[in-house]
């Protein structure tokens, strides 16, 4: 058995605690992250839960549990589609109505209806649908009505978050962006940051969307999504890969020639973006998405070995240690992505390294992750949301499960490729 017995046994004992029944205005069963997030449906959190639990459900050889996981995985998607608004908007999170009994629908939807522009469901909706469908060998649970909802979802992204001039997607603001306080977006002007996190995962979302529409008999729309993906990849290479530092950065797209009276009548701003040269773990995501060139991937591998920036015995610091914003203190709302170890970041960089044949680096990330969680479980009796990159000590939010299960994926994927 390639799994850590300590981690596997803990997850087996606690797995069902995150499989939630319908509650409040949430009509379908769903998976929550555990800990303080109990009873709410989250966008990318549910994706990574399903990503980890589906292969594990096969390994456990418990048919009833596997069927239950699949039911809850589908429920994640159905709940999100249930609260899609007429313009295609889908919220990032659906809170349990018991959180605020005055609400008749998700808070984010209420804000959107009131004309407040908000970020929307991160680009993991089609990825989760494709993940489930490929696992069970069936896409037909997504019917014609749901396909139209997916088209409206992509339309909403294009209309509200796509900057055609630069060919990249932007966060509207810094609310619920996944990496809560990523300094490339946190505290910056609205609609100004084309975040490498958002754009890397969007290439994967467009690919998954194309797979869904192909499987369900709409090759024309699938082709449109594939073409958009290729254009986006070109823009990421052109705008986000820094030829000086050999690293992928988020970029500032709020760059224009601002004329005033008779000033600035000559050569204007001809560049489309400015690099936000902050070394964040998300700079490695083009390797996860499979869009980095071999040369870019080799440069990223070298960055991973930069001890002053990303060195840790427990994985990858979410922000380079030599950035002035580096901070590992406990904070909630926003959670802290300014350097602590997060298992989802460890997995994404692990998988990217494995994609490009860098097995040694993948093994080191896996070993650090196993070391981290085994020690936490033995010492505290549970897993936490994020960790100190120097000591491996948990920072906060005990009882967190969610993407920490990805450590088992790491072990299995290394074993599968031997």
Identify the meaning behind each predicted range.
Residues 1-38, 139-141, 151-159, 213-214, ...:
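Acidic/polar, glycine-enriched structural segments that form the non-catalytic walls/loops
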Residues 2-14, 68-91, 97, 133-196, ...:
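Active-site acid/base region of carbohydrate-active enzymes
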Residues 3-6, 87-94, 159-170, 201-294, ...:
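Catalytic cores of carbohydrate-active enzymes
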Residues 4, 8, 13-21, 39-40, ...:
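Short acidic-aromatic active-site loops that bind/stabilize oxyanions
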Residues 24-40, 90-118, 166-191, 245-282, ...:
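Carbohydrate-binding/catalytic loop surfaces
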Residues 39-170, 196-199, 203, 280, ...:
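Aromatic-rich carbohydrate-recognition surfaces in CAZymes
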Residues 297:
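Short, conserved charged micro-motifs
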Residues 301-310, 319-324, 334-335, 348-418:
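Non-catalytic C-terminal accessory modules of carbohydrate-active enzymes
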């Amino acid at each position: 058995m390639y799994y850590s017995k300590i981690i596997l046994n803990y997850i087996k004992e606690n797995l069902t605690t995150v499989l939630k029944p319908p509650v409040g205005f949430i009509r379908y069963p769903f998976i929550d992250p555990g800990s303080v997030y109990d009873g709410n449906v989250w966008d990318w959190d549910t994706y990574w839960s399903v990503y980890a639990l589906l292969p594990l459900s096969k390994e456990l050889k418990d048919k009833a549990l596997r069927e239950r996981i699949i039911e809850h995985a589908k429920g994640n998607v159905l709940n999100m589609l249930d609260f899609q608004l007429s313009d295609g908007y889908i919220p990032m999170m659906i809170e349990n109505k018991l959180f605020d009994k005055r609400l008749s629908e998700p808070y984010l939807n209420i804000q959107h209806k009131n004309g407040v522009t908000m970020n929307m469901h991160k680009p993991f909706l089609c990825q989760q649908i494709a993940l489930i469908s490929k696992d069970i060998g069936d896409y037909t649970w997504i019917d014609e009505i749901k396909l139209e909802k997916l088209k409206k979802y992509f339309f909403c992204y294009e209309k509200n978050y796509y900057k055609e001039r630069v060919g990249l997607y932007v966060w509207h603001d810094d609310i619920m962006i996944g990496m809560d306080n990523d300094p490339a977006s946190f505290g910056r002007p609205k609609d100004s940051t084309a975040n490498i996190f958002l754009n890397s995962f969007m290439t994967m979302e467009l690919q998954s969307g194309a797979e869904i529409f192909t499987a369900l008999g709409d090759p024309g729309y699938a082709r449109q999504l594939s073409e958009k993906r290729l254009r986006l990849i070109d823009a990421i290479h052109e705008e986000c890969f820094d030829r000086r530092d050999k690293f992928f950065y988020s970029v500032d797209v709020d760059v224009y020639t601002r004329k005033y009276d008779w000033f600035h009548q000559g050569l204007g701003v001809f560049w489309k973006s400015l690099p936000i040269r902050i070394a964040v773990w998300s700079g490695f995501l083009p390797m996860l998405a499979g869009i980095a060139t071999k040369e870019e991937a080799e440069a990223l591998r070298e960055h991973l070995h930069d001890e002053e920036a990303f060195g840790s015995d427990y994985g990858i610091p979410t922000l380079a240690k030599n950035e002035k914003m580096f901070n590992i203190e406990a904070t909630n709302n926003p959670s802290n992505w300014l350097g602590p170890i997060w298992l989802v970041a460890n997995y994404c960089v692990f998988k990217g390294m494995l994609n490009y044949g860098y097995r040694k680096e993948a093994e080191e990330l896996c070993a650090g992750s196993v070391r981290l969680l085994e020690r936490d479980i033995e010492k505290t009796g549970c897993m936490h949301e994020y960790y100190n990159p120097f000591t491996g000590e948990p920072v906060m939010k005990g009882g967190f499960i969610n993407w920490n299960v990805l450590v088992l994926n790491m072990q299995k994927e290394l074993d599968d490729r031997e």
